[in-house]
Regions:
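HINT superfamily self-processing domains
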Residues: 60, 669-781
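Extended catalytic cores of very large enzyme megasubunits
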Residues: 2-675, 707, 748, 778-781
Length: 781
């Protein structure tokens, strides 16, 4: 039996009662901290004795709703303080203490850490305290203009009265919606600096900046700016990084996805490198289709030499990505697309391999192989396929389906074509070997992409993250000449046929917020997102003109979702079940219908996209009409064809504003990197998603694990304060230890629970239950 010394102690019973009743836990009598020998260096350089009451006040503020944890936070921070400490370092120690306590069992520490981190940002940026008085928007805009961070021409369109009205709409309380990691990511990544080390913006300024930039040219713009600000700051949806970083800046490049294609000539290869570097500089993620590039050993007419093949050029593009990183915020990124029948396909597949020398590797790029039904059937039949040099087989590029087969077999009959026969399964195994060893090699199915496209054009690649499928084509230099002007200056004039660099602007709906909305609120949110994203096409700066040509002609948007797993969890649906498939089908049917409807409404207001009559939209055909029938057959949900037919007629009659509307970007789902925090309820996400479908009965009837139903609701601590709960999921796997005290009470603790114990050397420390030994004296539970 372990001895217990009791002073200033809250028993588990008292603590539970306090939490259940919603009362704050009084820690005013905690032992005074050992402050006598600690000196604090303040921000202005002055020194003063450490005052534990100040730290206590901060910790109690951060632990609002979780006051019972403040004692632990203070004590665990105290032991880290040394004789002389900078106030910034001391504050950081409090934050680190809270962060280190975050776990699945104790998620409330994330709220505490987020509040502490937020207070640190307030102090460092504008010396704001717990009262949270944001600096005026007018002052932020002025400082941004003075430091050439903001575009003064855009800001000049807003009157002083409008800026005052927008300032009044800023709600600092929404800063508390962030998780700890989300706050750190957002502040470091999206809140702009005015010097290398000084932040210009706080989080709500960032959201307002984006809203002002995207809605500046709207009629009734203040109302629309506020609506967009509300949607962003309430985390109903999120914009992609280029929008969050570049909106309202002088170099306002807002596209996330940049798709390029090159020609098999030196001008195109080098011009493509320049274009990739420029877009990477402005935070775009890039992709490049190299299918036309001739293979190693191909003859070069202009120099009477022989090509070194794609590999050296991939190293060239890799160097560009390293040099032109995304504004210093993240590394440059490029995905290379190539055809399965390319003569050098095995060399390209090996470019990320851990083996080999640096001379024949380009490990900093991503790679995607373009497959089709012909090749897959050869794999199934275990037959041979023939690889070709694209220089000798130019007509094979941009062919799919029966056209590909006919052209391919025609080249098989020609004698003057460089080729190589391999087993289809040998190539297939190489693809999966590289995938397993490097985690890369995307697979792009040309026929699936082109058969379901709305654009009636060949699409030869996707983007960096393989969710956007839109066409691109290279510019061609048709003339280059010297011209002497009237004043004697000499100029070089180059003329190109206009190619297309396909651009797409992304946003993602937060499905957890979506779940809370009425149908009317959902439609209102979708209208706001479509309008805001569509405006990016017009307000954006285009550093490469091929991008402007494509974007203004087709006005591509990519609206997707985030927090999909959380959405299913909150609906009590296991992710890998038929029920999840049915729910997902219904969700995206509804979302797609609303997004297309919003784009039609915008077309009525502002006009259809210029390339409308080239596409399937003009025929009244919708994406659901071209969807993969096998995929649609995976669910039993009946489609409401009446509503889709009516919508198709509206599209045919009035047009649509955007040639493409949806794309599921690879957003984080309730991970530590996610900027947006969501409430997953009182259950662990992992436990909920992995459990079997069982009857919701009590533990007594199920055994070691299952749902435990309370006789009456109790208040339990969650990441948003105390909430009422009627049941709990018990997985039966948490190891515990029982401890009996001198008063006869026996308590059962999980092994990762901490108790304050006096160690054999007489010092006190918080010790995990698992680490307790018989020679320790428990001081506090």
């Amino acid at each position: 039996m372990t001895k217990v010394k009791r002073y200033n102690t809250l028993s588990l019973n008292k603590l539970s009662a306090a939490v259940e009743s919603g009362k704050k836990v009084d820690i005013s009598n905690i032992d005074s901290m050992k402050a006598s020998n600690i000196t604090v260096i303040k921000r202005n350089g002055s020194r003063e004795p450490f005052n534990p009451e100040k730290m206590k006040a901060v910790c109690l503020w951060a632990c609002t709703g979780y006051e019972y944890l403040a004692d632990e936070l203070i004590r665990d921070t105290e032991i880290k303080l040394h004789k002389e400490i900078n106030i910034r370092d001391m504050f950081q120690q409090v934050i680190v203490t809270a962060v280190n306590k975050i776990s699945l069992l104790f998620p409330q520490w994330e709220d505490i850490a987020a509040k502490l981190q937020l207070l640190s940002y307030y102090k460092e940026t504008y010396n704001i305290g717990k009262s949270i008085s944001y600096p005026h928007l007018r002052d932020i805009l002025q400082k941004g203009i003075e430091n050439k961070i903001y575009d003064k021409r855009t800001i000049a369109k807003y009157t002083a009265e409008e800026i005052e009205e927008l300032n009044n709409e800023i709600d600092p309380e929404r800063d508390f919606l962030f998780s700890y990691k989300g706050l750190v990511t957002f502040f470091d990544k999206y809140c702009l600096n005015y010097t290398k080390t000084k932040k210009l913006e706080l989080p709500q300024h960032t959201y307002m900046r984006v809203a002002m930039a995207l809605m500046v040219n709207e009629t009734d713009r203040i109302k629309k700016v506020i609506t967009l600000y509300d949607a962003l700051s309430k985390h109903q949806y999120t914009c992609a990084t280029p929008i969050m970083l570049n909106a309202l800046t002088p170099g306002q490049q807002l596209s996330s996805c940049v798709l390029n294609t090159l020609d098999d000539d030196s001008h195109s290869i080098l011009d493509t490198g320049k274009n990739l570097g420029i877009y990477s500089k402005f935070k775009g993620g890039t992709a490049l289709d190299i299918s036309p590039m001739r293979a190693k050993g191909g003859y070069i007419e202009g120099t009477q030499g022989y090509s070194s093949g794609p590999v050296p050029f991939m190293r060239y593009y890799e160097s560009i990505m390293k040099a032109w990183n995304q504004g210093g915020k993240r590394p440059g990124a490029l995905a290379i697309y190539f055809s399965w029948w390319h003569l050098d396909v095995f060399d390209i597949l090996s470019l990320r391999s851990n083996g080999g020398t640096d001379e024949n590797r380009a490990r900093g790029l991503q790679y995607s192989i373009k497959l089709n039904d012909y090749f897959i059937q050869k794999v199934i039949n275990d037959e041979e396929v023939t690889l070709f040099d694209p220089k000798d087989t130019p007509d094979l590029i941009a062919k799919v389906g029966d056209e590909f087969i006919a052209t391919y077999e025609n080249y098989l009959l020609r004698a003057n074509v460089r080729r190589k026969k391999v087993r289809a399964r040998e190539l297939w195994e190489k693809i999966f070997k590289e995938r397993s060893e490097t985690g890369n090699i995307y697979m792009f199915h040309e026929e699936n992409v082109n058969n379901t496209s709305m654009l009636n054009r060949y699409i030869g690649s996707s983007n960096l993250c393989v969710e956007v499928v839109i066409p691109s084509r290279p510019s061609k230099c048709i003339s280059e000449e010297l011209i002497t002007t009237e004043n004697g200056d000499t100029r070089i004039v180059k003329k190109y046929t206009a190619g297309e660099i396909a651009l797409c602007n992304l946003s993602s709906v937060n499905l957890v917020k979506w779940l809370e909305m009425s149908d009317e609120e959902r439609m209102r949110l979708v209208r706001t997102i479509v309008r805001a994203l569509d405006n990016t096409v017009d307000v954006a700066n285009y550093p490469v003109k091929e991008g402007k040509y494509s974007n203004t002609k087709y006005r591509y948007l990519g609206i997707g979702v985030m927090n999909y797993a959380n959405y299913l969890a909150l609906k009590k649906i296991v992710i890998d079940t038929q029920e999840a498939a049915e729910e997902t089908d219904a969700l995206f049917d509804d979302l797609s219908y609303k997004i297309i409807s919003a784009s039609v409404e915008l077309a009525i207001e502002k006009g259809k996209f210029p390339g409308f009559y080239e596409t399937e939209w003009a025929k009244g055909i919708l994406p659901i009409h071209k969807a993969n029938t096998k995929a649609m057959g995976l669910t039993s949900r009946k489609i409401d064809w009446d509503k889709w037919t009516a919508l198709a007629q509206r599209v045919k009659t009035f047009g649509i504003r955007n040639a493409q509307l949806m794309a599921i970007a690879p957003t984080a789902c309730q991970t530590k990197e996610s900027v947006i925090k969501t409430d997953i309820g009182n259950e662990s996400l992992e436990e909920l998603m992995n459990r079997q479908n069982i009857d919701h009965k009590s533990i007594e009837t199920i055994g070691d694990q299952g749902w435990f139903d309370f006789e009456k609701p109790i208040n339990v601590p969650t990441r948003f304060g105390n909430k009422e709960s009627t049941r709990i999921w018990y997985n039966g796997k948490v190891p515990t230890k029982k401890i009996t005290f001198e008063d006869g009470n026996t308590y059962e603790f999980s092994l990762n629970h901490k108790l304050l114990a006096k160690l054999p050397d007489g010092t006190e420390s918080w010790v995990y239950v698992n680490d307790l030994t018989i020679d320790m004296e428990i001081v506090k539970i």
